[in-house]
């Protein structure tokens, strides 16, 4: 199968690892390289694409600033180093993107932010708003609070979760190697690059090597795990070398890389997850006007809700029924049951007055809603 083209994609997550971003000898950001990458991001941005960055580097920068000795760090040492390094990392991204007139928005996430539906919706909404404002979200694991037991452990899998959460259609993992080889190329001179992976088989998994360097917690195995997460959610993924200047331009020009393809798309995969995987915790009954709006692809507004049943929390799946009690669809609700009961039947501007906070305009956003076919 022919490889896709970079410019075929509109919503792109780029993962940048510590070993690329930080000069390990000097303990400093590789400023020239990062400026070249920022220029690549700006080019995609000018083309109307949404670009998100998952950036490692906070611990590496922090240990350099604090002049910590080489070798493994204890958990509390890593957390403290991240606290120092994160400030500089955020400033660095703000400066290099700002040079192209692009705002950068820092988002620090923990494992629970992508695994718990309420927090998942919060993070997803923040990313969506930054993209709407044409800013570039710069995302990293919040290493200052993450624990050994509850963490991603590497930014490859974090990037895959972010791509899934943001419904990205492409995840790019920039690495110190230009793709997946049939064997570790450093050990086997006959190893060949695999340009396209259509399915992640046991054979493909067996080709992955072991872990990375002192700066990087990731290796090829974690990249294969990331590919599983991404492709199952309808996101294509590629691994390419980030050691060169302008790595995204090189990909666009047909440079070496490995594509992991998926037959699905992010919206289809996400809606299949909502419709078929999540257990509904309640029911919203809506009026005929709201039924028509949903079938036309609109979001469900509080004004269209006439009844609330069940005990559910924000982010839970609920069933949506029409006035005749027939199921219209399912979705992730933006309010808990108590608040939904208070604002049902009211227009969106009334929500703030009723709840005393600035709530969301939608009871269920259309991206979080699966509507069945209309009865014939």
From Swiss-Prot:
GO cellular component: cytosol
GO terms classed as biological process: L-proline biosynthetic process
Compartments, as annotated in UniProt: Cytoplasm
Residues reported to bind ATP: 15, 175-176
Gene Ontology molecular function: ATP binding; glutamate 5-kinase activity; RNA binding
Recorded metabolic or biological pathway in which this protein acts: Amino-acid biosynthesis; L-proline biosynthesis; L-glutamate 5-semialdehyde from L-glutamate: step 1/2
Entry keyword set: Amino-acid biosynthesis, ATP-binding, Cytoplasm, Kinase, Nucleotide-binding, Proline biosynthesis, Transferase
Catalyzed reactions per annotation: L-glutamate + ATP = L-glutamyl 5-phosphate + ADP
CDD domains recorded: AAK_G5K_ProB (cd04242), PUA_G5K (cd21157)
Pfam families noted in UniProt: AA_kinase, PUA
Its EC number(s): 2.7.2.11
Positions of the PUA domain: 281-358
Binding-site positions, substrate: 56, 143, 155
Family: Belongs to the glutamate 5-kinase family.
HAMAP family, alphabetized: ProB
Function (record text): Catalyzes the transfer of a phosphate group to glutamate to form L-glutamate 5-phosphate.
Protein name: Glutamate 5-kinase
Originating organism: Rhodopseudomonas palustris (strain TIE-1)
């Amino acid at each position: 199968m022919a490889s896709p083209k970079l410019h075929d994609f509109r919503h792109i997550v780029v993962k940048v690892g510590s070993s690329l971003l930080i000069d390990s000898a000097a303990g400093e950001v590789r400023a020239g390289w990062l400026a070249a990458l920022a220029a690549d991001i700006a080019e995609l941005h000018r083309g109307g694409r949404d670009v998100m960055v998952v950036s490692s580097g906070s611990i590496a920068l922090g240990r350099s600033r604090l002049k910590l000795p080489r070798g493994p760090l204890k958990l509390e040492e890593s957390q403290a180093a991240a606290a120092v390094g994160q400030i500089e990392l955020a400033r660095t991204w703000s400066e290099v993107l700002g040079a192209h007139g692009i705002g950068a928005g820092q988002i620090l996430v923990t494992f629970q932010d992508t695994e718990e539906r309420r927090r998942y919706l919060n993070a997803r909404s923040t990313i969506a708003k930054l993209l709407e404002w044409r800013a570039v979200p710069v995302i990293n694991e919040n290493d200052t609070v993450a624990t050994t037991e509850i963490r991603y452990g590497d930014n490859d899998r974090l990037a895959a979760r972010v791509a899934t959460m943001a419904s990205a259609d492409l995840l790019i993992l920039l690495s110190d190697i230009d793709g997946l080889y049939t064997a570790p190329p450093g050990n086997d001179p006959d190893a060949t690059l695999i340009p396209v992976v259509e399915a992640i088989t046991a054979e493909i998994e067996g080709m992955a090597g072991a872990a990375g360097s002192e700066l990087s917690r990731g290796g090829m195995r974690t990249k294969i795990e990331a590919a599983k997460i991404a492709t199952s959610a309808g996101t294509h993924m590629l691994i390419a070398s980030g050691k060169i200047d302008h790595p995204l331009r090189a990909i666009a020009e047909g440079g070496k890389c490995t594509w992991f393809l998926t037959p699905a798309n992010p919206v289809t995969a996400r809606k299949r997850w909502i419709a078929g995987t999540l257990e509904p915790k309640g029911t919203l009954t809506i009026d005929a006007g709201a039924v028509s709006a949903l079938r036309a692809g609109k979001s469900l507004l509080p004004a269209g809700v006439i009844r609330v049943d069940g005990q559910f929390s924000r982010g839970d799946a609920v069933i949506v029924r029409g006035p005749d009690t027939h199921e219209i669809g399912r979705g992730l609700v933006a309010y808990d049951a108590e608040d939904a009961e208070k604002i049902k039947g009211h227009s969106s501007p009334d929500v703030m007055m009723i709840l005393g906070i600035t709530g969301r305009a939608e009871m269920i956003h259309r991206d979080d809603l699966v509507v069945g076919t209309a009865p014939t």
